[in-house]
Regions:
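Flavin-dependent oxidoreductase catalytic cores
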Residues: 1-306
Length: 306
């Protein structure tokens, strides 16, 4: 095993990893009250103790409006000390600490984000479920700046790397996909225009990351449904991301509000999903899923992605 490439040191941008095993971002649901918990600390320090070179905290929104679930983090001063404790714990086990930054766009509802959900365009998200409005240009600029601020914040908390979430139908993905982006300004229409928000975010992130933080981007290989992004477009998007000088790509697939189980390679458990829905807030959607869910949501047969 000594000569196995997996267990050799690797340079990821400005940081050196003790091996090539990285725990990529996957939602833990351990940020109770939108704050880091002891469970979150124990989980990631255990990953580091197990020998991983880097472990990634997921998911942290760059603003309050970008929180998708109650168990998620968002950038604000009250979590700084707890995040410092978390990164100290990871570093004590010999691993690097990474955090996933993003904005969920329309993948939320008022009770969670405390505001009218926003997206690339106005519409209705069945998954949340919620109505959402299109972002104004000045709001787009504010979110771009929030990504830069988030990178600075995470550096102060001791993180070595940030992973930018540009897939799965979250906000950057909503701008990229023709399914959710029906804008008629410079942020919509052609793929070049649909990549504009992503490019602005990446430029801001790379400027603030400087020479001491690694930057990784999670991006789709395809959206997983007919009117979404295809492989050819996703290749162009990946090439565009690379132009910014990012240090690695995390390849994924799927669109939570349309093809959520594409990335997992299986069909959505409609009955189970309906069972666990809040009966008071979503009673109408719960009934709809039980009776006609199989007509609304396609079955996704298992297949290997790689």
């Amino acid at each position: 095993m000594k000569n196995n490439l997996l267990f050799t040191e690797h340079k990821l941008g400005p940081i050196t990893l003790r091996n090539r095993a990285i725990r990529s971002a996957a939602f833990e649901n351990m940020a109770y009250g939108n704050k880091p918990s002891q469970d979150l600390y124990d989980y990631h320090t255990a990953v580091a103790r197990g020998g991983a070179a880097m472990t990634t905290v997921a998911y942290c929104s760059v603003t309050r409006s970008g929180v998708s679930f109650d168990g998620q983090l968002y950038i604000h001063d009250e979590i700084k000390e707890d995040l410092k404790k978390l990164t100290d714990g990871i570093h004590a086990e010999g691993a690097k600490a990474s955090i996933q930054l993003g904005h969920c766009g329309n993948m939320t509802h008022f009770y969670t984000c405390k505001c009218m959900p926003v997206g690339a365009s106005t519409g209705f998200n069945l998954y949340s479920p919620t109505l959402h409005r299109a972002l104004k240009k000045e709001e787009i600029k504010d979110i771009v700046k929030a990504f830069g601020h988030a990178v600075d914040f995470c550096r102060e908390c001791g993180f070595d790397c940030v992973e930018i979430h540009a897939g799965h139908g979250y906000l950057i993905s909503q701008f990229l996909s023709p399914y959710t982006n029906r804008r008629r300004d410079e942020y919509g229409g052609s793929l070049e225009n649909r990549m504009r928000f992503m490019n602005e975010v990446m430029a801001e992130v790379m400027e603030h990351a400087g020479n001491d933080m690694a930057v990784v981007v999670k991006t789709n290989m395809y959206d997983g449904f007919k009117s979404g992004l295809k492989v050819e477009e996703c290749i162009r998007i990946a090439q565009e991301i690379e132009k910014h000088g990012v240090h690695a790509l995390v390849l994924t697939a799927g669109f939570v509000s349309k093809a959520p189980f594409t990335v997992m390679g299986g069909a959505m458990p409609i009955k189970t999903l309906a069972h666990y829905m809040n009966p008071w807030s979503f009673w109408w959607l719960r009934l709809a899923l039980r009776f006609v869910g199989h007509l609304m949501i396609p079955t996704v047969p298992f297949k290997e992605l790689f």
